[in-house]
Amino acid sequence: MLDANLKTQLKAYLEKVSQPFEIVASLDDSDKSRELLGLLQDIVGLTDKITLKTDGSDARKPSFSLNRPGADIGLRFAGIPMGHEFTSLVLALLQVGGHPSKLDADVIEQVKGIEGTFEFETYFSLSCQNCPDVVQALNLMAVLNPNIRHVAIDGALFQDEVEARQIMSVPSIYLNGEVFGQGRMGVEEILAKIDTGAAARDAEKLTARDAFDVLVVGGGPAGAAAAIYAARKGIRTGVAAERFGGQVLDTMAIENFISVQETEGPKLARALEEHVRHYEVDIMNLQRASKLVPAKNAGELHEVRFESGGSLKAKTLILATGARWREMGVPGEQEYKAKGVCFCPHCDGPLFKGKRVAVIGGGNSGVEAAIDLAGIVAHVTLLEFDSKLRADAVLQRKLYSLPNVEVITSALTSEVKGDGQKVTGLVYKDRNSEEFKSIELEGIFVQIGLLPNTEWLKGSVELSPRGEIIVDARGETSLPGIFAAGDVTTVPYKQIVIAVGEGAKASLSAFDHLIRTSAPE
């Protein structure tokens, strides 16, 4: 199951296991059970600290639990955790085996203090880059607190459950049999939902912080670069972000970040955060900005208010809140989001195996999505508003070579149809004939560009007609002492490498502003 190179790497990791435990597998006579058995035998063959039993009686087969004598740990994988979930498996082995987590001590204590009964189930796909964060967070919580149980379920292997629960997006998380959430979540986000008093406590702590010399709002590539450049100047630096990594977390293959030949979004996001944490930067996650209150007079502090109820003050600000997927804005879209309307073909594509889907958008992202999906689904219809596709020629050639793809141009998507539970089709207007036409399908993947996260800034800094923050050559906004960088600004070409450079530039400009405004007259 594991090649020699992977065995060597895993053996080195398993040397960190300090407490013996057992793997209990529940198997049947299927090929997948035999495949899982091979994986588990490979694992126990690398260390004498782990033993394997194959007499498990769990209803989900193939599956396995990790059990440590003397500890009540409710952690199970249903399926074969390879692909993106192999890291989740390795971390689970280490944590059940007594290796400490890198999670902040305060968060660990908060997890340990949770009371009640929490039976979590997470449905994932092996190609989903967002799923491991959820799986790893809940696995760790299950290791730390016996009141928390978690099963990570490969939706592709348990299609009957996926169909019964009408799951059309991963990760999908259930708590005690009810829908808990969808999409990427970390430990702190999960805690915020189950520990109802945490939000108020965190807001108080946030507001109590001293003012920063530079406060970066946003934790994507631009925000990370800005924080590093500021911290290296020896000034008090903070980063307040809804999620560190930003939109990079939702990006699959990255092959144009100079000096890194190939990587994946979550991996790059982790590297960015590790680099920032190397310096004295106060990182405040799960903070979504709600209002900017600029300083009224020179020498006063700017204030940023957050949806959590907390606020922060700073001498200078760098706004790097990035952008999000643009939605179609048509009837039915919100109702059927995550019920057939999706934005991540890598994550959710496997759930539509053998089904019919549409991709909305004929740029590079739309055409790449259609190409990826064509290898999984029965049929792909790509709809483009313009009279021609806008993707690179090499991508278009690949697209048109696929037998199960239809391209419709001059098409305005006008409605998402459904049966109250899931998507059943869409309606589009032929812009040439003005005729409305219907397509029967099960999934819609929206790939029509980005929308800047600037709603909270209206009435403060100057915005372009597209809602982007207008900046000058130094990254400064229309308000002195407030700078901006990355996809949220008017700087053209929304690329990671450009965002990093713009973040560094904005930070240098902010430092220059601090020097000039604090210099004695």
UniProtKB/Swiss-Prot annotation:
GO terms for molecular function: flavin adenine dinucleotide binding; NAD binding; NADH-dependent peroxiredoxin activity; thioredoxin-disulfide reductase (NADPH) activity. The keyword NAD applies. NAD(+) binds at residues 356-370. GO terms for biological process: cell redox homeostasis; response to reactive oxygen species. FAD binds at residues 213-228, 477-487. It is an enzyme of class 1 (oxidoreductase). Keywords: Disulfide bond, FAD, Flavoprotein, NAD, NADP, Oxidoreductase, Redox-active center. Its EC number is 1.8.1.-. Its cofactor is FAD. Disulfide bonds join 344-347. One of its GO terms (cellular component) is cytosol. Binds 1 FAD per subunit. Pfam families: Pyr_redox_2, Thioredoxin_3. Belongs to the class-II pyridine nucleotide-disulfide oxidoreductase family. The active site is a redox-active disulfide bond. Homodimer. NCBIfam families: AhpF. This is Alkyl hydroperoxide reductase subunit F.
